[in-house]
Amino acid sequence: MRAHPSRAYLLRDMFVPYNVAPNSNTLGTIEAPPRAVPQDAVLALLSPAIPGTLLAGLVTVTAALLGSAFAAGMARNMAGAALPAQLAVALFVPWNPFVIERLLQGQWTVATAGMLLPAVAYLAAAGRHARGLLFLLICSCSLTPTGAIFAAVTVAVFSPSTRARLMNLFACALAASPWILHALWSAFAASGADEAQMAGTFTDPASASAFAARAEESVGTLGALMGLGGIWNAEAVPHSRGTFATVAGVILCLLLFLGFKELWRVYQPAAIVTVAAIALPAVFATAPGIAAMEWLLAHVPGFGLFRDTSKFVALAIPGYVLLMATVTQQFSRSNRPVTFGRLTPRFLSTVMAGIFAGLAVATVPAYPAEMKPLKPVALSAAWDQIHNAVACAPAGKTLLLPPGSYRDRDGRPAISPALKLLPGSPIDPGFLVVDGKVVDGDAATIALLKDLLAGENTLRTSGVSWVLVDWESVQDPADMSGAMEVLNSPGIHESVALDGYTLYRVNNPELVDHVPSLLQKAPTLLGLMLYWIVSSAGLALWAQSTARTFIHQAHARPRPTPRP
């Protein structure tokens, strides 16, 4: 986990460098909905002191350890299971297809949120005495909007009273306020806008089918989801996840549901959420479900957050932990079926826990080796020169070519490093190419890119100060002919050319109408402030609770009896 300034985590949706630039993308002060706030904002604010790569690694490892520890606590204190079951659930939390596939997709904060859900569930059930650490973990989950939803659903299910539930949900809302306030502001601003501006608050309905849960070999869509898999991107599926692995996931799920009756009796809301987390993504992967999702994306602002339905199988993780412990505990009872003969309850429960652990491992049998793509990679030396050039005049926007936010260098598809390395305002066009189809996208940026590729120079009037071309990501140089006519015209000059990157400077861009005002930045900045307040409150409450515990234990120790 040792950090090096020239290396970064770079894979698909993930780019975490040593230092994250506090630009308009990472701080979420762009007009478009912020995609990775407060995740990138936290990295940008802390990376001068703690390297971003080190911080990301620490968060991921800590989430795995906490999730495993509290999963064992759930098995012990909420289901009465013995040590073998506790070890099985502790293994299951980091070793399941959801966590592994999301890490390989580059959604590391989504994966960490999923691993933290057993801890969130346990602390929510523990009541007010555990509230400090609970608030901290809610903020950790809320590094991504998806994680905030995970945390909100989990505390709603496991909080012991209505008052505790409302307080915990309020903390979730405050932790998620960086993107909630931005979404509300965007909806309010768009209410009086024209149709083109209004479209920016909705998601392309064509993306519904692209992001639907994916069927897996031999088990179909429902079977994939039962095993906590089914991610939409087949390239993010571990190579070892073949027929044996998918069938193992289905068998694991079927064995777990032997304890469903008991889970329904004791934790009915958890049982409902567990079933819904599997069933609803399967429904939205059918033709009627995709049609319903298309309608929701076209008519409900911000619903794009829910189109990747397979990620919500993470909500089943706390339920799976309880079911695993419950089934194991059922085999440890003295009134076991006579068919087991003279086998002791302890032996049977140990065997059952071993079966669960073995099936969890079998769902991704080559897990450690599958993480090889997540190793930090060396960044091009060109980025230092590009950063220094842009830093000399950070006002204005930096346009990225070829069009799109993602790059493919050395066979490694990943989000463009420019979005998190460069100061100022690197432009994220916001569109994705999924299965050859273009979905989403900021209308103004797409129009600007179309003009440039057609040979029309609207850069200066659009507030663009820099244009960065990544030639190794250009599939057909002929497609760049129109853009090169513009970039070689008077008023634009080459600033940096190194390692397949070329940076162009646009002279005298019109910046007045293209720099976000303080009013436009206010919702996200206020949200970030509220996020830090909740984090600080959680840290203070946790420190106070820990200090009280130590003091109480110190006073409770028996004092030695003085000799007569």
Residue locations for each model-derived region?
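Membrane-interface coil-to-helix junctions
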Residues: 1-67, 91, 95-103, 108-112
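Membrane-embedded helix bundles of polyisoprenyl
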Residues: 64-78, 84-160, 165-180, 355-363, ...
